[in-house]
Amino acid sequence: MNNLVNKTWHLAKNEEETKLTDFEFQLWRVFYGFTRWQEGCEKVANQTDLTGSELSLLHIIRMKDRSKTINELTRLLNRDDNFNVNYSIQKLIKNGLIRKILSDKNNKKAFSYEITEEGIKNTDAYTALRQSILIELLKKKKELNLEKFTDVLSELIAIYEEADRTVLTYMGDKPEVSKKLKKQ
């Protein structure tokens, strides 16, 4: 923990809130660091400027070497911004990395997305560079228990999702309801 960080945030009024705020601050930094890493790795491995979001979709589409529907993609990535997901999918199709296929012969409107040969080459190059840099760096951090950390992140996802569902119940309430919540 970095004790040099100024703890007087508008988000934290007591020790418990400060701990959560410190955690969320690090979470933001991890997210943006991870995104920069993905994009940099992709740029070096494949000379493309795909975004972190597009790369996540590409790797999830290849996952287990089976096609995925838009619903599966959004659920696997915990996303609800279908418009942006569709935009990213179109970019991946345009770049020849994935293709749209009919997923149900009885339903002409049911589509899924699968990786192309070009997409396999792309993700293989990304994987090789990831192994030579990131995996090697992680080997030096023997004290990191990624399995346990993954479990903690899964628990936090559930907490944030519950908080999101709760806040949705207040959407559209009159301002005085929000004021009452602030007092609690």
Question: Language-model segments: what does each one mean?
Answer:
Residues 39-80:
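N-terminal helix-turn-helix DNA-binding core of bacterial DNA-binding proteins
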Residues 26, 56-60, 121:
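Pre-recognition alpha-helix immediately N-terminal to the DNA-recognition helix
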Residues 67-111:
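Canonical helix-turn-helix DNA-binding module
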Residues 1-48, 97:
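N-terminal leader segment of winged-helix/HTH proteins
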Residues 93-147:
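Charged, amphipathic alpha-helical coiled-coil/dimerization segments
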Residues 128-184:
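Terminal interaction helix/tail motif
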Residues 47-51, 66, 84-87, 91, ...:
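Short glycine/proline-centered loop/turn elements that form peptide/ligand docking sites
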Residues 28, 32, 117-120, 124, ...:
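Generic structural signal for well-ordered, non-transmembrane alpha-helical segments
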